[in-house]
Structure formats: C-alpha cells, structure tokens
Amino acid sequence: MWLLLTLSFLLASTAAQDGDKLLEGDECAPHSQPWQVALYERGRFNCGASLISPHWVLSAAHCQSRFMRVRLGEHNLRKRDGPEQLRTTSRVIPHPRYEARSHRNDIMLLRLVQPARLNPQVRPAVLPTRCPHPGEACVVSGWGLVSHNEPGTAGSPRSQVSLPDTLHCANISIISDTSCDKSYPGRLTNTMVCAGAEGRGAESCEGDSGGPLVCGGILQGIVSWGDVPCDNTTKPGVYTKVCHYLEWIRETMKRN
C-alpha cells in the first residue's frame, strides 16, 4: 500500500525508526544492475523499471503517468558519467485487468521510441522460464527512500528521510506463500510473490516501486506494494510475479 508518494512529500518526511536506511541495503556497485531503469515524470524521478529488450521496459502499472521519460544506464541520478541514455515512450501499456485497490495485475510495458544502445552498462534483464522458489536468494534495487539518523536523533526532526542519488541494492529471499499470507491474510493472489529479509521486513520502500527483483540473474518480480510504514515493519514486500505474465508480455510486445 505504499504506492509511490510524491517526491516533495518524501523529502519532507521524517523517520522515527533507528537505523541507517529504510531500504536495508548498500549502494550498488556502479552499473552492476544494467537492466535498471529510472522513470521520470516532468523532470522528476517517479519509479524504477527494468529493460527487457532494446525497445521495451517493464514496470508496475501503478507507476503510470501522462508524461513518462526513461533513463537507462543510470547510477547517480544527479551526475552524468557517460553511459546514460534518455528515451521517450511511444506506448505505455498497463495490464488491462490492473486493479489499483487490490494491486492485482500490477504490471506495465513501455515501448521506447528509439531503441536502447546495448553495452555493458545497458543490458536487458532475462525473463524467467519458471517461477521462483521459497528461500531463493534475490536482489532488489532502486533509488527508493532511505533514512539518515544523526547520533542521538532517531525519532527527532533531525532524523530525515530522502531519496538517494545513487542506486541501492539489498539481498533478500523469496518468502513462501503460506508464510506471507500470515502477514497479509486474504490479500495475496497467485500473481504475487513475497520477498524480504528475516527480521528486517520488506527492504524496499517508497521510490523503489516498479523496480526489479532479480533472483539468480533472472527477473522474477516487480516492486509492487507492502506494509506501511515500510521503515517500521517486519512484513515482507509484495512483488508482481513476472513468470505469471510471460504470455501477456510476449503477446503485447508482438502486437505493438
């Protein structure tokens, strides 16, 4: 339920929880996630996404906006270090059965006007040939919300949250449907998959929406929703299960 908040709200918020960041990870090695995409709306960072072919990007349907721009090869959103590519979109195609309230079918395809130039820093993610297994090790990445607590200031106005400049990565694992259903009773469907880290919860937060969950080098999930607030929960995050949508992805790309 943490559909992406506006940037101004994120930057103005305060964190009441002791800890370094809401996404419990570290800065990714630059360009170690070459499929990572940053989506922009009117010049502002909006969501994450994944490149899946030179012409196509995959994200969450709740990230849809009217004026979308795509940035490839990014690491530090405030600096240009060479591999960045800016693209416009000719088609934005959310799943026809997307339901915002229930988060069902939270998946979207974007067709690029000009194809991506593939290189070591810009490379498509590999789509799955099977669904993920409980316990499988994964990496979630994004420019989502982080917190910075000065010593002795946790919970005070000086304990600020912000969107980082650099891409962050966190190591998490797939949670079984049975276990995840205990956290979100009656809310999960077979098109969703849960992932998190034991004792630390979701690991992803506002701003990570639409970004990749990669397991063994395979794109298995799209950051979709989770518990609120994400800095104060042990519940896992919920991801759109990419393996369930392979036919829709392929047919949509073929028709467009």
From Swiss-Prot:
Disulfide bonds join C47-C63, C138-C215, C180-C194, C205-C230. Residues 22-254 form the Peptidase S1 domain. InterPro entries: Peptidase_S1_PA, Peptidase_S1_PA_chymotrypsin, Peptidase_S1A, Trypsin_dom, TRYPSIN_HIS. GO terms for molecular function: serine-type endopeptidase activity; serine-type peptidase activity. One of its GO terms (cellular component) is secretory granule. Its EC number is 3.4.21.-. One of its GO terms (biological process) is protein maturation. SMART domains: Tryp_SPc. The active site is at H62 (charge relay system), D106 (charge relay system), S209 (charge relay system). It is an enzyme of class 3 (hydrolase). Residues 17-21 form a propeptide. Protease whose physiological substrate is not yet known. This is Kallikrein-15. It comes from Homo sapiens (Human). The gene is KLK15.
